[in-house]
């Protein structure tokens, strides 16, 4: 109401002042200044009315014009009123300068750079540097970064004993989370870090050791002896060799597969405040060490609603194959609201348009399949589902396009990576994003995360002795 009165008053003033333009230009300038100040005040605040009382809260506008209501003082000024937002669909837990995502327009940028440009022109290690330090590296900076990582790539032999203690049937994500957490015990200097140098050392250590843990986890799953990498190779080349090298065989690099994996890792490197990233920041807000925070993020990523989606895609494709491989039948089931079947790998919670990452990785998937010439009924089913969905008005109108999980699962299948390892590969790509988010949270000295709740349980009850219950 007060704002309406202000508007009416300003409009009245405008009518009077317009008549005086020729007589008093200074008066017009003063009026315009007053108007701008009033509009600025009105646009930078939000009014919340509770039980007839109004409260003003500032609006925060991001560099991409996202607007948020700053309610840090809500409980203090209202006498204890809080908000509730299950799933945090409308809640910003932080301000971040790392990744921008516009789901409506299908836009994804790391530090201002379009994901399309990075996937086409940069390699994974360059993108990791960009995310963690904010700028693309020079040639000298990248060389030093890689050299420092290689120097820290040796994993303590006692970590092998921990790995050996797991049964072969253990899920690789559980193994990876445990091994990552164990690194804290072998690298105590990475826990209580404050300075830029300490954060850098913790960063290059985990970037060096994490690929080894990933490769060991896969080799354990396949029954292959554990190995170390080749420091003469590039970062992703070394990862490939560690995963695929076989005893008594000379390893030969496949450039098509190398390019596809490099792109996949870039596309998965960060995705702003998703479940696992928010977990890393939340755990890190208690000043837990980087590796403990990463271990928690890995566990969050393990969930089938998050990182496990690409594994779910392949399991769905296998189920369709076992049922005869009729893709049209399953497309019809997906459109039937009374059917419990869900088409995995299509649509996205955030992207209301085509997932920009999926456009990129579809090309890589086509290249991989063409190069390997694999005859695989599961991959044929995947291609059939994709083609039908992209031409079916039901899916097109609802923007249910194949997402990055759909195509990444196809590539990993073609590369011979076990289905249970898919989410581990996701974690490998997401590592630099998690590091960047943890580092940003610590450097901005964000408070410990402590969400509120609305209690809906029993009111006070009197205790009864067991004989009277």
Regions found by a protein language model. Name each.
Residues 2-3, 24, 41:
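Intrinsic-disorder-associated, low-complexity terminal segments enriched in Asp/Asn/His/Tyr and depleted
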Residues 42-469:
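Non-transmembrane, aqueous-exposed alpha-helical and coiled segments at domain scale
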